[in-house]
A protein has these predicted regions:
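A short, low-complexity linker immediately N-terminal to eukaryotic Hanks-type protein kinase catalytic domains
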Residues: 16-35
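Protein kinase glycine-rich loop
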Residues: 36-42, 47
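Conserved N-lobe loop of protein kinases adjacent to the ATP-binding glycine-rich P-loop
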Residues: 51-58, 65-69
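AlphaC helix of the eukaryotic protein kinase fold
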Residues: 74-105
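Activation-segment/catalytic-loop signature of the eukaryotic protein kinase fold
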Residues: 117-118
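Conserved short submotifs of the Hanks-type protein kinase catalytic core
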Residues: 121-136, 140
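Activation segment signature within eukaryotic-like protein kinase domains
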Residues: 156-157
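Protein kinase catalytic-loop region centered on the HRD/HxD motif
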Residues: 160-172
Length: 175
């Protein structure tokens, strides 16, 4: 993959670095998406800030990277599965791609982050997600201590319920 020197969205220099084992800041995927800083990591993969290079807007990039099945990332950014885990790595990689392609078909459903693209590269899969900004629920709760009235909670979470219902309609189960 190529590497950009600055963000195509805001022009800011890519001076920062991501931790070892993650994609380097400035990596370009499919000639269209630039990887920014790592936001979080979980057992399924890594979440990065990103930018769409043509329309120059922000995106979030979710990379398939199952920690328990991945041995390393090569110097060329290619994921290498652990010895003996090759079949499971490939199967779960295909499941990850299928999941995000399914969500892409039902978005924009209320309450779901739109999946703009699914890119396969580096022996991995990247879900390119709409980045609307906003405040994560844990931060909102931290800034608004105390009890939330049930009616207010239902109003706030209604889009989430609708998104999960849309997923269930096509046979996806939220875990």
């Amino acid at each position: 993959p190529g590497a950009a020197q600055s963000c195509p969205h805001c022009g800011k220099s890519f001076a920062g670095r991501n931790p070892g084992g993650t994609l380097p800041v400035g990596t370009v995927l499919a000639g269209r998406y630039t990887v920014g800083e790592m936001l979080s990591i979980d057992g399924e993969g890594i979440l990065y800030r990103g930018a769409e290079n043509l329309g120059r807007f922000r995106v979030t990039i979710k990379e398939y990277l199952p920690i328990t099945l991945t041995a390393e990332r090569t110097a060329e950014s290619t994921l290498r599965p652990k010895t003996g885990s090759e079949v499971l790595f490939k199967t779960t990689r295909m499941d990850f791609a299928d999941l995000y392609r399914s969500i892409q078909r039902i978005t924009p459903a209320n309450g779901l982050e739109a999946v703009l693209d699914v890119v396969e590269a580096n022996n991995s899969v990247y879900a390119i997600l709409e980045n609307l900004g906003g405040t994560p629920l844990d931060q909102w709760l931290e800034n608004h201590p105390g009890t939330i009235r049930p009616d207010d909670a239902c109003t706030m979470l209604q889009p989430v319920f609708e998104g999960v219902a849309a997923m269930h309609k096509i046979g996806l189960v939220h875990r």
